[in-house]
Amino acid sequence: MTPREWAWEFLRRNPAFQRDVTAASRPIAGLTNPCLTWSRRPATCHAGVFCFAESYGRNSIVFWSPLWCVHVLPVIAEHLPASSETTPYQLLALPCRATVLLAPDKGQHVLLRNAEHTLQLAVSGADILHPVCLRTEAIWPAKLLRHRLRALECLNALSVGQRLPARLFPREKRGPRLNFVLRALDGSLAGASHRELAEALIGQRRVDADWRDPRDHLRDRIRRAVSRGRALMNGGYRDLLT
């Protein structure tokens, strides 16, 4: 999974976030497929990022805050004069699903997605539901450069009828470790003891042999995994967005 996908896996397990998502208003207006428009309040949690989410399910539509997530591409939408020779940008012409979120501050957030990947735009200016010209800054801080260039390449690919390139969505290198931590968190949230977690994650034979070792290596490993999982669930996932 990508870093954003791992961030979502931890955030969506946060009980406060789940309550906020459940309490948030539902979509109130829809357009014809493949474009859907929402107008709703944000779902947040006490230790979390400003985030809009359809639900807290694994495959939910999720909008991350541009203030936190480096993968969101900010663009300016401008009306095209009738005499313009510029090819207009039209959501309904793209070879992907498009969801537009209308935020309370009048901001427009666009999520472009195919079966595997997503691209999020933070749009200011003209109404993105009409044919427009999109502009963005050409110079970015060094820490944003790689992410912005990837997002631009994704946007260009969609604009010429291609899919979102898989090579622009690298997997998180810490995936195996995060998977271990996530499974430990799930077990802990379900009420499992540390020994039960160890048996599920490492195997009963190893646990029977090493659980009472005075050096506590196995116990410490489980304790660290649970602690790390809860930290990621309660706000630490933000590090995966930057």
Locate predicted features.
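Surface-exposed polar/charged interaction patches
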Residues: P27, L158-G161, L232
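DNA-contacting interfaces and partner/effector-binding or oligomerization modules
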Residues: M1-C133
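Intrinsic-disorder-associated interaction segments
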Residues: F10, P141-R148, R215, I222
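Short, charged/polar micro-motifs that form catalytic or ligand-binding hotspots
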Residues: P3-L11, R167-R174, R183-G187, R212-R219
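Accessory, usually C-terminal, subdomains that scaffold auxiliary metal cofactors
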Residues: R174, L178, I202-T242
